[in-house]
A protein has these predicted regions:
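Generic anion/oxyanion-binding catalytic loop in active/binding sites
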Residues: 36, 75, 82, 90, ...
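Flexible, glycine-rich phosphate/dinucleotide-binding loops
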Residues: 38, 124, 192, 227, ...
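Activation loop
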Residues: 43, 82, 204-208, 297, ...
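Residue-level signal for the nucleotide or nucleotide-sugar donor/cofactor binding architecture
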Residues: 60, 88, 96-99, 152, ...
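N-terminal Rossmann-like NAD(P)+-binding domain of SDR-like oxidoreductases, especially those catalyzing
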Residues: 1-189, 326
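Residue-level recognition of oxygen-bearing side chains
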Residues: 64, 70, 92, 99, ...
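NAD(P)-dependent short-chain dehydrogenase/reductase
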Residues: 129-146, 160, 170-247, 273-280
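C-terminal substrate-binding subdomain of Rossmann-fold SDR/epimerase-dehydratase oxidoreductases
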Residues: 18, 57, 213-342
Length: 342
């Protein structure tokens, strides 16, 4: 039987590399990545070891995209995913996140490829998410409130990053309507696990672990500086397993949007994450307070996985302790190689 041929864009990023390595056991995988991100060359070496080809170019270059082979499926993981960067460098974020996706859609149209698009929880309006927590100074532990699903409000300000991803979703739906493109859109919350090189505004789980392991300082930022903001966290392996199921069923189940996250099975506040990191690393570090809240920050987000569970009989198997432990073990094993990336 002929192997399905898949292109993963952003293939040397955290999600893209994990997906490529996982799906390579089942399909013919190739990647495209311009190697602009920190850590991408580390991940490129892993692809080479596993004989996965990477095309080194920018997906904004449509002429180069057209020269790529024909694929049965494109998985679009390429994004400038930092909310704060999106405020400072609008042109780069729009050209990468939106125009890059449009180029892939044109390629998919010509080749009659299907597409799986990794979107974000940031498509939802900030004011609606802020309304879930009344106080701007969260000085006590939050309880689980509403779970966010596919039908929740996407109107209003959401960050330039979130806007580009929502706009990409709309272009995908238009291409589906006009050109019979088959697609799946996954609106993912926080994703973490091995191969993630963390920063303050992106990849905070791996950053927290790295700082504890190296006895370096951190800050709780916003909402009074108490560290009580809550996010659900999806282990990258759980996401890979879901996408494998989606690929196998895409001829039967397509043209749908799913919210995908750790949900109530895997969530944490920053203060709780600190406690977990202290236990795992056996190190206690200084945590400062920065009380001023970014206009793009939100106090609470937990995904409702009801639809994706009903559709694919899938739910996360790994909890927040698994996420932290697995990431810690990867960092510990490769610490000398990773120093220049954190």
């Amino acid at each position: 039987m002929k192997k399905i041929k898949i292109l993963i864009t952003g293939g040397c990023g955290f999600v893209g590399t994990n997906l490529a390595l996982y799906l390579n056991n089942y399909f013919k995988i190739e990647c495209a990545d311009n190697l602009s991100r920190k850590g991408s060359r580390y991940n490129l070496n892993l692809l080479k070891i596993n004989k996965i080809k990477n095309y080194n170019f920018d997906i904004k270059d449509f002429k180069k995209i057209l020269k790529l082979p024909k694929y049965d499926l494109i998985i679009d993981c390429c994004a400038e995913a930092s909310v704060e960067v999106s405020k400072k460098d609008i042109d780069r974020v729009v050209s990468t996140n939106l125009l890059g996706t449009i180029n892939l859609l044109k390629k998919a149209r010509y080749d009659k490829s299907k597409i799986i698009f990794l979107s974000t929880s940031r498509v939802y309006g900030i004011s609606k998410l802020n309304s879930l927590v009344k106080s701007k100074n969260i000085n006590k532990k939050l309880n689980i409130k509403k779970l966010i699903n596919e039908k929740d409000d996407t109107t209003g300000a959401k960050s330039i990053y979130g806007l580009t991803k929502l706009s990409s979703e709309m272009f995908i739906e238009e291409f589906s309507y006009a050109f019979n493109l088959k697609y799946i859109i996954n609106r993912c919350g926080v994703i973490s696990g091995p191969l993630q090189f963390g920063k303050q505004d992106q990849g905070f789980i791996s950053l927290w672990i790295w700082k504890h392991l190296n006895k370096d300082n951190l800050n709780y930022i916003g909402y009074g500086g108490h560290g009580n903001q809550i996010r659900d966290v999806l282990h990258i392996t759980d996401l890979c397993k879901l996408i494998l199921i989606q690929i196998r069923k895409i001829n039967m189940i397509n043209n749908k949007i799913f919210t995908v996250g750790g949900s109530s099975q895997s969530y944490t506040s920053l203060s709780e994450l600190t406690n977990i990191c202290q236990k795992i690393t056996n190190n206690k570090i200084k945590i400062g307070k920065k009380k001023i809240t970014s206009i793009y920050d939100i106090p609470y987000y937990i995904t409702d996985n009801k639809l994706v569970k009903k559709t694919y009989n899938w739910e996360p198997k790994k909890n927040i302790y698994d996420v932290v432990t697995d990431t810690y073990m990867w960092i510990l094993k490769n610490k000398k190689k990773l120093i220049k990336y954190f």
